[in-house]
Amino acid sequence: MTQANSPHLLLVGNDQKVTWNDGRIRFLAPGHDSLSIFDAGADPARPEPVATLALPNSLFGPPVNLAVAPDQRLGLIADSMAWPARDDGAGWQPAPGRDLYVIDLAARPPAIAQRLEVGLQPSGLSINRAGTLALVANKAGRSVSVLRIAGGRVEVCGEVDVGTPVVAVSFAADGRRAFVVKTDTHRLGVLRIDESNAAPRVTHDPAEDLTTGLVPFNLVVSPDGALALVVDMGSPTASDGHADSVSVIDLTATPPRVIDRVMVEDGPEGIAISPDGRYAAVAIVQGSNNPPDEWFHHPRGQIVLLRIDGLRVTRAGAIEVGALPEGVAFSPDSRYLYVGNFLDAEMQVLAVGDEGLSDTGTRIPLPGRPAS
């Protein structure tokens, strides 16, 4: 889930191929995924639907596989998994894919403009603030794809080998660095970016890696560029019943460094920082997709609100939401938070204030289960 500037487009990627039955994962037939496009500008308390596109999407990976360019003329969405039939004919067997779609958001209605191939299993992606470059973290490819954006078109112009599975990436505020999540090695890699020549140059030196908490899965950089927050999932299976953390990274220091860890409940995945930089929200799975007889199962997920004061990050409250919350995004005015509840196939709207989070009661039905 991601939002952009005025008219404040909000993208929601829906995956209808994956579901759970009594806590057991099931793989369903492809062909029913979609991308929902909303405008959160006119009424942030209840975003208005703009369009729904038939488009493949995947729950596999962090819920940051889509992004909107700063000028809002295009969007990117990565589909991390191909979906072939099993050899024995008994259903479907997901496998790493390579597809990335470019959406023309200026068209009426919005439309698919390009289909590109990037590295294997494209997961999290990010567009720089100048709108000239995008990076895609490829989990199975152990690489980061580099995409040039110009004239409403996107071109794959490179791939950086990082030597280990990576699942999420985010640009620094100045666009000269980016940070990539190395989930298997519990590290955050630093990418150096040079756009001074015709072809952008992106490099990676493992010696600059930072150690995060266990199983980092997602990250976000603050609007002022001073800090990054890394979701430490704690277990490759997300929920395992144990408390997890969010690593706080000082990006103003040389070199950048972890300065704190804030404890959160079991199974953090989605994360977003408000446009005004005052708050961050973390989606907590809390075993809501696990079998009911598991000791750590909860029927609902949770959102934890974090308060940001300079480089200091503290808990500011929590609230229960629907089952298996994935993507989260703030409204342009920072007063509302949108939560994609996967198993409920809905977008829930929370109010954000000095007293924390409150439920507005608004539930927006979606044409599928929101994976991002």
Task: Report the location of each language-model feature.
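Predominantly soluble domains enriched in secretory-pathway, periplasmic, or organellar proteins
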Residues: M1-S372
